[in-house]
């Protein structure tokens, strides 16, 4: 299948909501799939040393202007360029779902973290209210250019399977929080009704993504 061409804005999201998950004392940070480097540039402004890997050549070129080091290529292509036991934090903001074998990749990257280093990630939640609504009532699963049903996503996750991804691959989850809660007039009431009927057991459906901080075991 031919590569799906993304709009330029796809690579330029600063993801400011993820800054809260970066430890304050972290000094050296690697972002995998940095796009144009907007998120890591915010960390650089705080005095952090910022490294990145980005497969898109144009985005990597832009990111290199504001970050300390940027390697253009995939994880497998550039893993050997990264020093072992070097990073306080590795970040993947909505990247894991684009990987064909994410469990292998997070295991490979573990050696690049310092002893007390953490892996910070944002991963889309396939149980988001909009998705459930479309499957149940529109009886459809329609891929799109972005968001949860992005046509370039290889893997789909729930809150439970996100935790399992980390716990079964050499990490312990330190923190997990839903982010980007639905504000839609159509889907917020649906999520509320679902939780009323099921005694608040479906709170995960409110969130588009889950942010996770995982420490290597």
Segments predicted by a language model, with ranges:
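Conserved N-terminal segment of class I S-adenosyl-L-methionine
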Residues: 1-85, 89-91, 103-106, 160, ...
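A short hydrophobic/small-residue beta-strand
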Residues: 50, 119-120
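Short catalytic micro-motifs in class I SAM-dependent methyltransferases
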Residues: 93-98
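Short N-terminal helix/helix-N-cap motif within the alpha/beta-hydrolase-1
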Residues: 100-104, 131
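A short glycine-rich, Lys/Arg-flanked "PGG" loop and its adjoining helix->strand segment in the class I
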Residues: 104-118
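Conserved class I S-adenosyl-L-methionine
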Residues: 120-142
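Acceptor-substrate binding/catalytic loop of class I
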Residues: 145-161
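A SAM-dependent methyltransferase catalytic signature shared across enzymes that methylate proteins
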Residues: 160-177
């Amino acid at each position: 299948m031919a590569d799906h061409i993304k709009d330029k804005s796809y690579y330029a999201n600063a993801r400011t909501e993820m800054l809260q998950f970066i430890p304050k004392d972290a000094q050296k940070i690697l972002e995998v799939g940095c796009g144009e480097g907007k998120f890591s540039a915010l960390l650089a402004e705080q005095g952090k040393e910022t490294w990145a890997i980005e497969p898109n050549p144009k985005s990597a070129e832009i990111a290199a202007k504001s970050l300390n080091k940027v390697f253009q290529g995939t994880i497998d292509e550039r893993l050997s360029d990264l020093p072992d036991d070097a990073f306080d934090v590795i970040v993947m903001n909505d990247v894991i779902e684009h990987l064909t074998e994410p469990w292998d990749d997070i295991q490979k990257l573990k050696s690049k973290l310092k002893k007390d280093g953490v892996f910070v990630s944002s991963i889309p939640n396939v149980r988001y209210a909009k998705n459930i609504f479309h499957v149940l009532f529109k009886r459809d699963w329609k891929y799109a250019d972005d968001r949860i049903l992005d046509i370039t996503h290889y893997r789909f996750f729930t809150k439970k399977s996100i935790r399992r991804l980390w716990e079964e691959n050499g990490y312990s989850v330190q923190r997990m929080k839903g982010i980007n809660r639905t504000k839609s007039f159509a889907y917020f009431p649906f999520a509320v009704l679902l939780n009323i009927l099921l005694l608040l057991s479906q709170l995960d459906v409110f969130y588009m993504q889950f942010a996770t901080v995982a420490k290597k075991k």
